[in-house]
Amino acid sequence: MWRRADIRVRIRPKLSAGIFFSQQSRWEGRSMFRLHKWYLDVVTDTGDALILYAGTVECGRIAFDYASVLQYRDGVNRDVQSVRRVAQPRLQADAVTWCSGPLRVEGQWIRDAQEIQRTLVNGPDGLINWTCHMPRAQATVQLHGERIAGLGYVESLTLNIPPSKLPFRTLQWGRHLSDRHWLVWIGWAGCGDRRWIWMDGEEQPAAALVDCAPSRLNGGARLRLSSPRDVRDRNVLEALTGVPATMTRRIAGSLAGMHEHKQVSRSSLVIADHAIDQGWALHEVVTR
């Protein structure tokens, strides 16, 4: 494993609460916490996975940018992060590009499926807006001079709900991509069960999550996961390396019990025990 962590912190001007909220967007009118996060990935034909994150965290008057790269190849995980000179991905028509000098990564995702947008939460504790910019894409990434190509996925998330008030005890998320089909799912449990599942651009209101995979899809299909490999299995607090100490103290308590388990699996859509495609799924379970 190789890791780097550099720090770039921004301090807001100190304003009274009334002035602060009057100058902020609707996101910050309810909370002093805000997160905007990009998630991008690519999985090769052989199941090697590359996951990239970029975003901004704001907590009170403290704000910082961050980016990280998680690579799984041949059973080995490599994790590198930076919170200095962080560039955000650029969305232009049917392409997303991202380049990070500190991380030595440059990538492009070309759209192969239409965007999905949902407001997952809009309540007294705040908002969660989710946009799946590219449920399936043709992705090419250069990492430390190595070319990695395959089917990829791009989403972004914006929320202003503090970690202690997230509306779930267990979160399930995943995406399955093949040359013929794609599938995206989000499921919450523990604080009011919710789920959102799409297959090939159509929402699946009758579908369910069974053993962490979508079932009861249109046409009687279900997703079969096999040969899972751990990409990340850790307490979320371990991700705070390099985060400003002031920020860490503010959010560490609410993250103390949060755990993430991310896997890459061989995956197939199955109808009546017959596989109609074959691809790769990235999926995770987060508990708190």
For every predicted segment, state its role:
Residues 1-288:
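Targeting-peptide/extracellular-domain and disordered-appendage signature
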